[in-house]
Amino acid sequence: MPRRSDLNHVLVIGSGPILIGQAAEFDYSGTQACRVLRAEGLQVTLINSNPATIMTDPEYADHTYVEPITADFVEKVIAQQAERGNKIDALLPTLGGQTALNTAVKLYENGALERYDVELIGANFDAIQRGEDRQKFKDIVTKVGGESAKSRVCFTMDEVRDTVAELGLPVVVRPSFTMGGLGSGMAYSADDVERMAGEGLAASPSANVLIEESIYGWKEYELELMRDGRDNVVVVCSIENFDPMGVHTGDSVTVAPAMTLTDREYQKMRTLGIEILREVGVDTGGCNIQFAVNPKDGRLIVIEMNPRVSRSSALASKATGFPIAKIAAKLAIGYTLDEIVNDITKETPACFEPTLDYVVVKAPRFAFEKFPGADATLTTTMKSVGEAMSLGRNFIEALGKVMRSLETGRAGFWTGEDPVGELGEVLARLRTPTDGRLYDIEYALRIGATVEEVAEASGVDPWFVDQIGGLVELRAELTDAPVLGEELLRRSKHHGLSDRQIAALRPELAGEMGVRALRQRLGIHPVFKTVDTCAAEFEAKTPYHYSSYEMDPAAETEVAPQTERGKVLILGSGPNRIGQGIEFDYSCVHAATTLSEAGFETVMINCNPETVSTDYDTADRLYFEPLTFEDVLEIYYAEQRSGEGGPGVIGVIVQLGGQTPLGLAERLEKAGVPIVGTKPEAIDLAEDRGEFGEVLRRAGLPAPRFGMATSFDQARRIAAEIGYPVLVRPSYVLGGRGMEIVYDEDTLEGYITRATQLSPEHPVLVDRFLEDAIEIDVDALCDGTEVYIGGVMEHIEEAGIHSGDSACALPPVTLGRSDIEAVRRATEAIAFGVGVVGLLNVQYALKDDVLYVLEANPRASRTVPFVSKATAVPLAKACARIMLGASIAELREEGVLARTGDGAATARNAPVAVKEAVLPFHRFRKADGAQIDSLLGPEMKSTGEVMGIAHDFGSAFAKSQTAAYGSLPASGTVFVSVANRDKRSLVFPVKRLADLGFKILATEGTAEMLRRNGIPCEEVRKHFEEPSADRPLRSAVEAIKAGDVDMVLNTPYGNSGPRIDGYEIRSAAVSMNIPCVTTVQGASAAVQGIEAGIRGDIGVMSLQELHSTLVS
């Protein structure tokens, strides 16, 4: 079937910001789709609110709209294209996760698609409904002869209670049309049911929840399937969850292909999956179906399906080399599977099901340390913020590699402290899944538990437990052997052990380098295998490699020789986590593409299956490997050998992937690896407070005063000397507590007692905190002789809120010419003083007309993609070229950088871009079910970001809020309760809200201040105050939970009752999903955004239009 000739213009909806449950995998999917559609001659319009994505680069679509993904804004895009005589023919919603699917459903239901004659392709409305609606899907499973868990769809709490009475406790609560298990959970008591079902009904766009019998402890499997318009179906991959039912699949270790299924069970699952796919009606494209098997009797039930490309699709694509999103896009425009050629073999068609001769393991990355008090129990609500994937010739090798890929400070088993407790305690702990369960399983086996005891306690299949048991036996061999001989060392490496693990068991080898030296002496190195989709039946034309230690010393590597071009290795950023996300992958991808175009051979090393960088055709070669010193060095040697007789490896880039590669720079350089760009010594200089302070002193640049304390008395003296408030950050942290702003001595003592372990080895840093200062972020390039300012961003929140969590505007909204010139001079002095070659990010605070330097990072920052989108200058591409020898003058001449001027001087008519952080507070709860605090501070907590662009700040800010959290209210009630120090500053914003017609609620002190300033308000009592006969008021929290508040303005108090009151207020706002502003500056910005919304003139603008304006 040829491509449909009636389709000329396709709209692709992206997935928006990185969220828990919906992450970078959809950038990978969407980027693939856009490239394929344009290659087929179609015009592509894209809408996505996330500036950190590759897909929102202007070259991937004809019209790129960085706009909120709501039915309103998507309709504005469709209308704008129609008005310009450029009608959109079809909407492809299956590549942007749940966000895109839900938006497509709304556009269908509100008639927008019919109004503009836009067809849904990939999955029609009925198929989406049948796949996503719990009851309809259950009916389909029954119709095709399958079985579902006993359950009922409920629309009211009364229906929920009746269903629970019938099924008995525990039950699983699952809302419809949500992602990452949001709102779902296991309810063990009537109280759990009331809370979870109430929130689930609120979380579900269709206002219903499924109450389901508990299948906790069953084995969980997934199938990834694809279907074309001629009803050809392929099963791309089977995936088995290491963890049993009850742990969300995104939080589970998963294995491909499935390890413990019999062929009979697999064939039954496959047949059922294909029948369901046909009955649901996914005409073209991919879908994911989840199954559960009772380990006691083999009963098979169908859990759910995603009638779209999903998180598992990205994993399956990277695991097999079968590009699901790319093929789904081709199927959506009319091709059939037999007409699509496999990119890796270049000769087999896509209707050949992939075959694996290796094992793939994915493991989740958690960030519980960022949310003190959050319950770390793993449940049906997804909590992980990222993931790593590894490939090996056997399960245990792949498991070892993925454990060291997670970058948790360990290199696998035995490289950290052992779990605590006697055997009975460890087995009891295994009954409640947590992120430390792998270590508990190994430890339980090591101290005497049987495989059966561990399997029974943990719910993990005995086969997996036995595999870890094999490692425990190997450990005993390693510790007991008088001499570590070649056979035992080779077998240890074959079982996935890192040099660090072996060194931990053999102290006489004097650490990792000693093990490495022994391996080199014995000639024990990994071979590099190729992912080829067909178990070596056909030759792979795409160099996509993974390492394995073979028992046969004569095993050959599959890295092909390449002697013509100089090789550049690019170290990626590893698993996403809070503080190091997709923004760094963006810079790595840009480096790969631009350096390939410049004539280098690019080699990407990364272990994150969600990203564009690990697509097999992003770089010239891809190694899916852990980003550790050992693994990177082995790849370097393999590439050097493959380039013998030619230029070989001419450089390794560590500057673009965030902290992970930077942490390897010094050791790699000492091992003889050529680091290009800013040298490791310069990176160290910028991070050393004393040395960097000397650079600032020589340049005459002020920085906030600070001191190091090794006791509370010393900390108290330093704080008294430099003045409160102070910012304290311990060098050794307990319980995940990081930095905190402290306003008085009592709070300082409480914080140090609670959060730190002070000693001469572990001092605490006490910084003067610049209250009410404006924070400024600068991204710049330096080639050693010239500095190019990429962009100057003004933070909307005050200094003290982590820059990754603060909204910011570009160009700056309140800075004058003299301020920006001061920023330029300071940035130039720092770049030359540190010795930067490439990118530099500097953070400043402006207070009382003095510009203070807060910190400098000589690397790509998380704002690089945002600045690049806002200014039309590809900073990461320019950085890569500079690191390999190009000058800023040459890049200006080529048109890569602006020919004159730079990002410090923006045109007067330049649109305003606002970046807003997206925070995951609603995902985390305390052990008692209470919400965690949504207060912002110096510790970063956001998972992603959005961007709003408009011709004025208010409209841009309103867009950013709509994209991140939903629209700001245009009317209704605002609750205000602020600290005394903020009351004067908040008078004007609150007065403006009252003038706009908002009703104001306030607690006693705030209400009194507002009335004195002529602002009418209604008083409510504080949460911790008891009602009395003379003040029978309802509390602020009661008003919020009753749905009577549309926005909250709440700034934090001290540590006593009001502080707790603030926590309860903010938690209620998060649970009710209403805007909650916790800074004065945020309140002022929100008021401007509300005014813009009320004016009703917020339009849409493509990046191509924006960039043509800026260039002209």
Swiss-Prot record:
This is Carbamoyl phosphate synthase large chain. Mg(2+) 2 binds at residues 304, 306. The keyword Ligase applies. Mn(2+) 3 binds at residues 843, 855. Its EC number is 6.3.4.16, 6.3.5.5. It holds the Pfam family CPSase_L_D2. ATP 2 binds at residues 729, 768, 770, 775, 800-803, 843, 855. Composed of two chains; the small (or glutamine) chain promotes the hydrolysis of glutamine to ammonia, which is used by the large (or ammonia) chain to synthesize carbamoyl phosphate. Tetramer of heterodimers (alpha,beta)4. Residues 966-1112 are annotated as: Allosteric domain. It is an enzyme of class 6 (ligase). It comes from Mycolicibacterium gilvum (strain PYR-GCK). Disulfide bonds: none annotated. It catalyses: hydrogencarbonate + L-glutamine + 2 ATP + H2O = carbamoyl phosphate + L-glutamate + 2 ADP + phosphate + 2 H(+).
